[in-house]
């Protein structure tokens, strides 16, 4: 069944030439506060964290453009890639999704429960949304993909998902079984080179330190590389790095 009507941001923010020419941006310092995000509360009460304009833009451009491989478009004469990463407004992934606008990506935002209702669970809801809008990058928490596997979701019934070329996960470890399920489902749709961008990051800097790289091979249930500018190491019990082990 069709989902609720959606609104394109281009329709709500359209300006005529005169209004656009008259707009004057307000120039601010590099570290001027942009937004406040809150920690999860796992280790106590949620803590407010203020992020500045400059640092947020630098981190977001490196993550979205280089490691998530999203941008204006791979095809001429269209409105750019369609980027969706399901998130509530209370999770930093909402802010991360919005930063896709920095490099010309069209953000597709879903308002609702990705698993249907409590009385009528439906783990195809978000997939149908992606199929309707022709999403090219589809991201969600790793738990979402695990629930789809558990529910036996069949993506072959949604041919509109053929536009998807990348899947993103974060929030918790993605199991190899869940990743293999997703890869197999997209192969049924004729998408034989689906790329998984599994990332790990933090609210404290509104970014990721481990993520994806289109030039590296995929290992189900694993992340591909440390991100640019991030000093990331895995240590043994003696506090020694275990490079290449």
Language-model features and meaning:
Residues 33, 39-42, 64, 83, ...:
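Conserved S/T- and glycine-rich ATP-binding loop of Class I adenylate-forming
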Residues 1-30, 151-152, 194, 207:
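ANL superfamily adenylate-forming
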Residues 1-3, 12, 47-50, 106-118, ...:
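Short beta-strand->loop structural element characteristic of the AMP-binding/adenylate-forming
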Residues 55-82, 89-136, 151-152:
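Conserved AMP-binding/adenylation subdomain of ANL enzymes
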Residues 25-28, 220-226:
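Short Gly/Pro-enriched turn/cap motifs at secondary-structure boundaries
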Residues 25-27, 34-58:
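Conserved AMP-binding A3 loop
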Residues 105, 135-140, 149-220, 231-233, ...:
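Gly/Ser/Thr-rich phosphate-binding loop
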């Amino acid at each position: 069944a069709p989902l609720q009507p959606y609104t394109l941001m281009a329709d709500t923010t359209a300006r005529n030439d005169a209004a656009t020419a008259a707009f004057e941006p307000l120039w601010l310092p590099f570290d001027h506060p942009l937004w406040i995000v809150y920690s999860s509360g796992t280790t106590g009460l949620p803590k407010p964290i203020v992020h500045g304009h400059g640092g947020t833009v630098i981190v977001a451009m490196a993550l979205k453009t280089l490691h998530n491989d999203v941008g204006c478009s791979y095809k001429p004469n269209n409105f750019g890639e369609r980027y969706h990463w399901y998130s509530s407004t209370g999770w930093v992934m909402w802010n991360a999704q919005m930063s896709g606008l920095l490099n010309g990506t069209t953000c597709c935002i879903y308002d609702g429960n990705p698993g249907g209702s409590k009385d009528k669970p439906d783990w195809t809801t978000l997939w149908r949304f992606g199929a309707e809008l022709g999403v090219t990058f589809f991201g969600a928490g790793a738990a979402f993909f695990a629930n789809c596997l558990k529910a036996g979701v069949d993506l072959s019934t949604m041919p509109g998902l053929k536009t998807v070329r990348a899947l993103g996960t974060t929030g918790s470890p993605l199991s190899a079984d869940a990743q293999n399920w997703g890869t197999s489902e997209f192969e049924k749709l004729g998408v034989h080179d689906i790329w998984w961008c599994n990332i790990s990051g933090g609210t404290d800097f509104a970014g990721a330190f481990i993520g994806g790289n289109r030039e590296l091979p995929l290992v189900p249930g694993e992340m591909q590389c440390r991100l640019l500018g991030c000093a990331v190491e895995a240590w043994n019990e003696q506090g020694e790095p275990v490079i290449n082990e």
